[in-house]
């Protein structure tokens, strides 16, 4: 479908009177021209990546949630480094071990239920980077300890801290090993292997944990021969530990429309994803689950005629936050806005969605760039960045698209993937749902007839 909007800019005399104003080179050019905006809907399909890198993250995701795309489970694996200058001796008397994790401040999902996490010791050292989301590392059968907390706003403590009731044997081993092991980063890493925090199967939320600058670790408590209480902490954040930190993020779409996406070459067309609240269809971007939207651009500029010059090319799409939809009006009544009771804490709309080139197998290739070589992001507008029911994403692809057409005119559609930036997949659980097909918008300039 094509929609053409034509407007005449103000005459040159008025422009001269307003010469001190900042001009819009697209809609207020010099000299005056006729501006025509042509739009065309684009095919959109949801695809799911087979795997993506989740190693050396800035933020760790933890938990389990069940939403539009099915069950998503995020599990962080990490190693620890010992303190410098700490003295641990075999003749010291063990007291206890505690685990702590700085909360990242964000929770997504149903926060009306208690959440429980379990800490396990790894049997093997985690693999070094790059590590992908489908990787796992064997762990001991019994947890070192567990912790239960309320996930609601204002209820999550800034630091999750709990005693490891099943770690007494480990604590005594650490004292017995002495400073030669406990004070040497490489030896300690080889000794402990690492830890994994796992969400209980009953959990309904995904939370963020902050591993930076000693944000997570275990604290060993003991007292010396004179009865003086002492402690030292083994923490995350050291540069040598970063390559061994990663997340396993697994999405199981069983029972949802997206269960047809069994491999990355599969695609779910927009119209085939119609459901309640989305009568025309939907397409999904969900970084934690690996979901991206494939869009196919025409191999010629919509609205191209002799005498027109393309001034700007954009891709735009409308989204609605999961759970919000509008019911059709009944005769004599107004349409009703409905909020499904899907989640107590709505998933945020990503502040930006990046565009990538792709191929017939839906592989993520180079990022689309502008004239300065910077990645092109679709920016969320007309919506609150913290809580919004809907909004519009807009991406300026002028440089990329015109350059691409000049090199490969007539060679078929240009396919792009829209998704959470690949370097931010481990830091956000943002979920974006298109409720209408995306469109390409071309702003044309043509001379004003005298």
Regions found by a protein language model. Name each.
Residues 2-5, 20-450:
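Secreted, disulfide-rich extracellular signaling modules
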